[in-house]
């Protein structure tokens, strides 16, 4: 489903732990990392799409998280011309996204990025709150900056109430 301007409606998901760190996922078979995200199906609300994508990409359900915030507006990014599929109709030039900030309620061992037949990710790790803004692929960077800035007032008090351990930069694979 592509809108009249060529943007695909999509949801993005920022999952934080009680220390205010965020889940950073490695794209399957690639060296790039990002937050979970995915398209909104026809007839689906952004919140419904978020819960579906949460399960598909991270293996978590409603009971495993709490919604702390969502972005007020749709945020857009354009795909680089080399990634646009010009032979499809309608042509998708980018994504418009509604973002959700979730707090993890379950044990982190319940996170399973490889539970589906076609996983989006092959590993994940906790990183400091602002780390993704510097590390995401360049064409998504402005959206990530805006999302993290909007959610900062919710997450920063969590970080202040707990002494933070250093972020681990080794990533986790789902156990076989």
From Swiss-Prot:
Residues 6-149 form the Nudix hydrolase domain. GO terms for molecular function: mRNA 5'-diphosphatase activity. Keywords: Hydrolase. It comes from the Bacteria. SUPFAM superfamilies: Nudix. The keyword Cell cycle does not apply. GO terms for biological process: mRNA catabolic process. PROSITE patterns: NUDIX, NUDIX_BOX. Its EC number is 3.6.1.-. NCBIfam families: PRK00714.1-1, PRK00714.1-4, PRK00714.1-5. Belongs to the Nudix hydrolase family. RppH subfamily. Accelerates the degradation of transcripts by removing pyrophosphate from the 5'-end of triphosphorylated RNA, leading to a more labile monophosphorylated state that can stimulate subsequent ribonuclease cleavage. This is RNA pyrophosphohydrolase. It comes from Photorhabdus laumondii subsp. laumondii (strain DSM 15139 / CIP 105565 / TT01).
């Amino acid at each position: 489903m592509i809108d009249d301007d060529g943007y695909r409606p999509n949801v993005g998901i920022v999952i934080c732990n009680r220390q205010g760190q965020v889940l950073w996922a490695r794209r399957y078979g690639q060296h790039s990392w990002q937050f979970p995200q995915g398209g909104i199906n026809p007839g689906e609300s952004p919140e419904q799409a978020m819960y579906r994508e949460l399960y598909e990409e991270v293996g978590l359900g409603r009971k495993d998280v709490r919604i702390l915030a969502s972005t007020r507006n749709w945020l857009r990014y354009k795909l680089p011309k080399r990634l646009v599929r010009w032979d499809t109709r309608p042509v998708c030039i980018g994504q418009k996204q509604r973002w959700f900030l979730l707090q993890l309620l379950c044990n982190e061992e319940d996170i399973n990025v490889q539970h589906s037949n076609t996983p989006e990710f092959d590993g994940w790790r906790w990183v400091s709150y602002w780390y993704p803004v510097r590390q995401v692929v360049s064409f998504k960077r402005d959206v990530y900056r805006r999302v993290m800035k909007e959610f900062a007032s919710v997450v920063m008090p969590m970080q202040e109430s707990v002494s933070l351990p250093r972020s681990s930069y080794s990533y986790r694979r789902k156990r076989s």
